Amino acid sequence: MTLQQQIIKALGAKPQINAEEEIRRSVDFLKSYLQTYPFIKSLVLGISGGQDSTLAGKLCQMAINELRQETGNESLQFIAVRLPYGVQADEQDCQDAIAFIQPDRVLTVNIKGAVLASEQALREAGIELSDFVRGNEKARERMKAQYSIAGMTSGVVVGTDHAAEAITGFFTKYGDGGTDINPLYRLNKRQGKQLLAALGCPEHLYKKAPTADLEDDRPSLPDEVALGVTYDNIDDYLEGKNVPEQVARTIENWYLKTEHKRRPPITVFDDFWKK
């Protein structure tokens, strides 16, 4: 088995999908989880205005709506959380995503004060954060806020990780990578677009250039620039297609060096890191 085949198998990626079937699969997955653990009353998700959180948010609200109708349990809710750092450049996209999702509840937590306070505390301890590390601080502060909300609403935190993100480890460890349940896992980027199109999402929300937008020195830096490879390349690779040798090498290098991000903390029983 080639490394490409191993990666595809590990991430559960498929070369082709039926959008309606995958929508149903994710919604039923969320419903089943909530029914298995009836003490869970809410799904909590940060909404950025990008493709992934828009899709995950819509699926969460669909699952909650169906469960309420089927069980009569009105205590179930989906909580969409806006988590800007100061003023967000694409705020209108966030509002458009909220309008599309129609969440039960919307909360806004501006993380700038908390991030700056943490940075100042570290500075006083003699640690000056780089812009890159400050970006990770933002991602972790966002997740911290979501877990606080989940803790106060008997909820779980929903993630947006998918195959095209997992393969490169393009998330912050214990930031946006630290969640309870990931309904998009297995899909690549173009497949996520197919699901949103089938759901009637406004096109500008999934046709915009994806960006983590964590660095102050490089605002709205496109993911594809940061990764050195396009999502079309990544999706082709995940679909088992032949890609240029340099593209495959770049993707595989990302995969191998970020393996620790896709695993629990390393113990004496692990040996993957020795390879």
From Swiss-Prot:
InterPro entries: NAD/GMP_synthase, NAD_synthase, NH(3)-dep_NAD(+)_synth, Rossmann-like_a/b/a_fold. One of its GO terms (molecular function) is ATP binding. It catalyses: deamido-NAD(+) + NH4(+) + ATP = AMP + diphosphate + NAD(+) + H(+). ATP binds at residues 46-53, 160, 189, 211. This is NH(3)-dependent NAD(+) synthetase. Belongs to the NAD synthetase family. The keyword Metal-binding applies. One of its GO terms (biological process) is NAD biosynthetic process. Keywords: ATP-binding, Ligase, Magnesium, Metal-binding, NAD, Nucleotide-binding. Catalyzes the ATP-dependent amidation of deamido-NAD to form NAD. Uses ammonia as a nitrogen source. Deamido-NAD(+) binds at residues 140, 173, 180, 260-261. It comes from the Bacteria. Mg(2+) binds at residues 52, 165. Its EC number is 6.3.1.5. GO terms for cellular component: cytoplasm. The keyword Nucleotide-binding applies.
